[in-house]
Amino acid sequence: MLSLTVYTEINTLLFPQVVTTNADSDTLFYRPKRSGTGATIPGIRSKLFGLLDLSLEYRSVKGSYVPQFFDQSYDLNRVISASQGNETSIKTKDMAIFEGYDNDWTSSGVYGSASMNLFDLVKFNASYASMTADTIEYNSFNAVINVNTDNIPKLSVANAFYRRNNDKDPFDFDNPSENTIMGYRVGYEMSKGVSLIWEYSEFYRDNGSGELEPVKQTKVET
């Protein structure tokens, strides 16, 4: 069986101006005021045989806006440091993405996603977006696999993910960027309603010499 849904969405991002000075009124940090809007006109979503979900969108952006700005890796790349010679600069995520652009900047492109539920055992989801502004192209790729743990004793959650958003080539796996993050989460059920979660993630940051190196992070939480 096939179901079809047509929809539209409009979203905005607002970034207030931030200025930090020292006692001599020298500017230490400056972030300009920015804003932007993104619209999906139209979007089409379909479901095939109750197993495969597909969606396709045409996206239009004006100003300082990118889809999935607040993704699940936001806490890791909300502030980015970059080194050049003996100087290190600190930028927020919006400063790094929108540097060199103003609120009259426009872009457009397509977004597609597919997810499949395999007999309620494993669910896989992947999405890809390609946006173009003048001659500049930035793309995003996300993939997540979730295991249904309902029938696995003591296992409360099990998933793995790969994300690379707003990048020139998100499939260049040999050359990751600061927008790349991958990892997994595994949960052990200690008692009903209480789980011990082990989360591993790997992302990339400037090592102080202008080169990227992997940062491996492990968290344990309940």
Predicted features and spans:
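Residues on the lipid-exposed face of transmembrane beta-strands in outer-membrane beta-barrel proteins
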Residues: 1, 42-47, 56, 112-116, ...
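Long, internal scaffold/assembly segments composed of regular secondary structure
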Residues: 1-97, 105-106
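Residues that define the transmembrane beta-barrel architecture of outer-membrane proteins
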Residues: 35-40, 50, 104-110, 137-143, ...
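Outer-membrane beta-barrel translocator domains and adjoining extracellular loop/strand segments
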Residues: 17-32, 67-73, 135-142, 169-177, ...
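Transmembrane beta-strands of outer-membrane beta-barrel pores
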Residues: 10-16, 58-64, 128-134, 149, ...
